Amino acid sequence: LELLCGPVPSVRRRAYRIAGVHCLVGRALHDMTEYTDAEMHFRRARAMEPYLCMHMDIYSLVLFQLHREVALSALAQDLLAMDPRSAMAHIAAGNTWSLQHQHDAAYQCFRQATLVAPECAYAYTLAGYEALELEQPARAVRLFLCARRCDRRHWNALAGLGQVYLRQGYELRASEAYAQAFLINRHNAVLLDLLGWTLEQAGDADGALAVYQRAIDMQPKAAMTRLKKAQLLLATVRAADDLRLSPRECT
């Protein structure tokens, strides 16, 4: 991204004539949760190469995050028509079902993707999230660990493990998982938001406030993070007031 945004216009012009470059930029923007900009680059890539299959799993995730139901369904149909056995097609189809809250159908698609591409970390991770939606946390953990075996730097699987642990009440393990995910992807404010919330649930108000502030500094428009920070500050002030009042109440 630094090279493509750098001071040499000729480099930028040549690079952006290649569909694969747009896909790589789209992937990077996806990891930074800049989904609207990511969508633009993936659309340009497909306009250049309509039969492009590589990276389309990430494009389908971008469309999922943006709730582009029609575009996501069209992408899945195109990929299935090109190669009904490809993992990319099954992942796009799974994201289509998941967006419609058909989690069992989505899970089956993602599991099929793991069968045709056992090395695809994302397929295991997405299957893990669907297992979690289906109230199968043990299966979700196994799938997230499979994703980690495929790719040790697959931060999405760590975030999934954090979600499982948090639901189970293991705040310390959840915070460790989110912290590891952020060490891999240091440009994702959502991971900081999740880490802050986990620390808050663990009773570490100071740590949570510090992490929330880092997330806000990274993404100033993060309204939910600002709300969480404000609510925690208010609760902290109230707790301090109660502590000051308690000696008087005892007398």
Where are these regions (language model features)?
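Helix-start (N-cap) detector for alpha-helical repeat units in TPR-like alpha-solenoids
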Residues: 19-20, 52-54, 87-88, 121-122, ...
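Eukaryotic tandem repeat interaction scaffolds
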Residues: 148-237
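Structural signature of tandem alpha-helical TPR/SEL1-like repeats
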Residues: 2, 32-41, 66-78, 99-112, ...
